[in-house]
Structures are given as C-alpha cells and as structure tokens.
Amino acid sequence: MTAEKPGLHPRNRHRSRYDMNALCQSCPQLQAFIVQTPAGEPSVNFADPLAVKALNKALLAHFYGVTQWDIPEGFLCPPVPGRADYVHHLADLLAEDNAGTIPPQATVLDIGTGANLIYPLIGVAEYGWRFTGSETGKDAYASAQAIVNGNEGLTRAIRLRRQKEASDIFNGIIHKNESYDATMCNPPFHDSAETARAGSERKRRNLGQAEDGALNFGGQQHELWCEGGEVAFIEKMIAESKLFARQVKWFTTLVSRGDNLPPLYRALTAVGAVKVVKKEMAQGQKQSRFIAWTFMDDAKRRKSF
C-alpha cells in the first residue's frame, strides 16, 4: 500500500511517496544522491542542496516533461509538491467562474517567477495555461529564460519580463490592453537580511545540519526579504492592483502566516475589492494559504476578455 501525503490537493501528482527508481530513470544523476532510510527505503538527504536540486530535476522531468532545468548556486530550490498545490487550488478558483470547468487557455501572471520558474512550468504542463513571468534579478531572469529556451514548446507558452523598478510590482509588467485571468506570487517573507539568515539557521538546525554545512535554504535578497516583510510587500501589491482592476480577474498571493491576514483584509477593504477569497492548503504538518481578490463582480468575471 502506498502512503499518501496528508493535505495535498486531490490532483497533486505528489500525494504518494516518491518512486525513487522511476525518478532515477527520468533523471539518472539523481542516483548519486540516493541514501537509505533507517527503514531501508531509498530517499535523499534533504539537508544537502545538491541532492534536493537533483530531486527537483527528476520530479520536473518525470511528472511535467521538463528535461532541461537548473538554477544557479545560491537561489531558492522550491519544494515541488507545495508549489503544485497553489497551481491546483488556483485552477479550482478559476473553474468557479467557468461553470465548474478549469479554463484550458487561462492567462496567468507570475510575480517574481524566480530562477526556478516553478509555477509556469507546472501550470503549462498541467493545464496548458499561458504565463507571463516577472523578475527583478538579472541572474534569476537569465536562469528562467534558459529554462524556457531549453524545453520544447515553452517559448510559445511562457514569456518573461524584467521588472526594472524594484519598488514596483504590476507597474511596468502589465501592459496597456493586456488582460490576465489571474496573478500569482510567492512574496518575500522576512523584513531584513538578519531575520532571513536566522530563519535559514532554524531550518538547518531542524534537519540536524552542521553549522558549516551547505544550506538548502539559499535565496537571493529579493527572494527572501524586503523592507517591512511580507505584509508590506502584499500591501503594496494590493494598492497597485487597483490600477489594473479592469485587466485582471483574480489577484492572488501566498500568505505565509495567518497572523498576517487582518492588515491585508483591511487593505483590501480600503481599495474597494469586490470579493476576497482565502484558500487553505496543507503539506503534511505545514499549513499555508493564499488570498485572492477581485474588482469584478461575478457576471463580469464569467465573461471572456
């Protein structure tokens, strides 16, 4: 009997334990990182960033057909199952406005797509959506573009735009006469470099990693922290979203802590959001959520742009 990971979305391909043999066939370089658990089952050392990156390569190749994927050293290596959950729950939200059917040609904007390009890769493979990914960092942008260029078919489904103004979110990215069914975002969580380092250190201790061990909790400044932390970033996003109220059906963003929700709800009320939705998610013991808001009523959202 195959054990299931509790809480993951019913359509998530990662509900069952990893079949390491199948993953190694899809990505032979994973084989070098396979270790045995105390129960004698094959696994990887999740405190080893190279092992985690190899596992991600294998997952993306095996489940999503992404054969060319890499990220530069020091960038975030995302947990694929949790990222996939956001995509699937967003699909459910869009289906509610489409007579219960997930729209196959949805257009989605991924804010801060990152060097890993994880949300567009999953969204294109699972639902055939078309993505625009924004990115502020030059190296992250180049990495994401290399992934697009290296995989057949992605150049028609994913386009990237460089956000040249670090203080802007939608400004300069959503062009005049463009429209999107939804936006996505995994915002920076910490409010300073110091708290980001402390958070990485806590995770490292939880895995029993030596103090001088390589971090699997990498990340560039813009990936991990911003002035004012997550709440300030999302409040800025909410304020800017009002400017594009007629061009986007649903604005969405992850919110790492439930404690951060009250000020965000107040900000959404202040800008006149017509409807606000919270989608709860869970990956094992970890609880997460995203909020979605719109300036369109139900009838308008159900019409095509």
Swiss-Prot record:
- Entry's InterPro entries? METTL16/RlmF, rRNA_lsu_MeTfrase_F, SAM-dependent_MTases_sf
Locate the transmembrane regions by residue number: none
A Gene Ontology molecular-function term? 23S rRNA (adenine(1618)-N(6))-methyltransferase activity
Q: Does the keyword rRNA processing apply?
A: yes
Q: Keyword set for this entry?
A: Cytoplasm, Methyltransferase, rRNA processing, S-adenosyl-L-methionine, Transferase
GO terms for CC? cytoplasm
Q: Subcellular location, in the record's words?
A: Cytoplasm
Q: What class of enzyme is it?
A: transferase
One Pfam family, short name please? Methyltransf_10
Q: What is its EC number?
A: 2.1.1.181
Q: Which reaction does it catalyse?
A: adenosine(1618) in 23S rRNA + S-adenosyl-L-methionine = N(6)-methyladenosine(1618) in 23S rRNA + S-adenosyl-L-homocysteine + H(+)
Top-level taxonomic group: Bacteria
Q: What does this protein do?
A: Specifically methylates the adenine in position 1618 of 23S rRNA.
NCBIfam families from the UniProt entry: PRK11727.1
Q: Which protein, by its recorded name, is this?
A: Ribosomal RNA large subunit methyltransferase F
